[in-house]
């Protein structure tokens, strides 16, 4: 297992019974995760400090129940990369933090090649909000970011500007 240990503003605090307790910056969120099939004691203090919990709807989608006022967006940092976080109506925050190990891997490859004078071009398809795009560009690659959703492309541009 590879760990993305460069997060400055993200951590999984706990997980139990299909839910993940995460801290994104200074906001604690509870989100569903079908991979979490075990049960542990949710009476720990961290669970009581959640700023928001995402509840799935039986008809699809879901909604956030907020216990404190969440900003529309805020930033988190992974190493020297910055990303905007926005809780959306389908549990996502705009970033898959577990992908950071992949960003590290290809960043090492890109840096090694560009240091030897080679130009690296990356085509990032289904690129979402640009986590991989930003990481590849920061490592020295020329990146073509492609996503069918205009809103995601705009968000990726925001993330690129942050980094």
Annotated model-derived regions:
Residues 1-4:
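N-terminal accessory targeting/assembly segments
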Residues 7-22, 29-97, 104:
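Non-catalytic substrate-recognition/targeting regions of SAM-dependent transferases
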Residues 21-24, 122:
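Short, surface-exposed loop and linker segments with low hydrophobicity and enrichment for Pro/Ser/Thr
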Residues 27-28, 142:
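Structural motif
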Residues 107-163:
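Conserved SAM/SAH cofactor-binding pocket of Class I
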